[in-house]
């Protein structure tokens, strides 16, 4: 389903009788206080992006990405997905991100990186949907 609202909730409002965080407890609380069916509330983690946790402990990563309005909930993969950037891009479920059909953009050369740092050039790769390729451009040229 499509994310239409994101609410924050203290984790202590989600504790069950054993003191363990439990999504169903949070769903019941939200249903009571927001008058929407419990099953419409799906927990997300503010600290998770691209299946990585902000603390550096990726075992804490939860549901791929922090949900945002317009994101799509993928129940099969347990991931919140942002809008697909290009029609040809595919789901990379390992990193919870969209990826071009030919993979990530090539790395810039050391010379290009040095030119970017010196602000003499601004080399970047941009996805070319019609050509299905990464095009290198200098945005300062």
Model-predicted regions and their roles:
Residues 1-141:
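Interaction-interface detector
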């Amino acid at each position: 389903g499509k994310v239409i609202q994101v609410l924050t909730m203290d984790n202590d409002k989600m504790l069950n009788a054993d003191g363990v965080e439990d999504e169903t407890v949070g769903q019941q609380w939200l249903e009571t206080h927001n008058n929407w069916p419990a099953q419409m509330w799906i927990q997300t983690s503010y600290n998770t992006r691209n299946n990585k946790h902000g603390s550096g402990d990726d075992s804490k990563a939860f549901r791929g990405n922090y949900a945002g309005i317009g994101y799509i909930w993928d129940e099969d993969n347990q991931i919140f997905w942002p809008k697909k950037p290009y029609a040809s891009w595919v789901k990379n479920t390992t990193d919870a991100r969209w990826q071009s059909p030919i993979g990530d953009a090539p790395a810039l050369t050391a010379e290009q990186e040095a030119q970017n740092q010196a602000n003499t050039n601004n080399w970047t790769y941009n996805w070319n949907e019609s050509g299905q390729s990464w095009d290198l451009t200098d945005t300062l040229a």
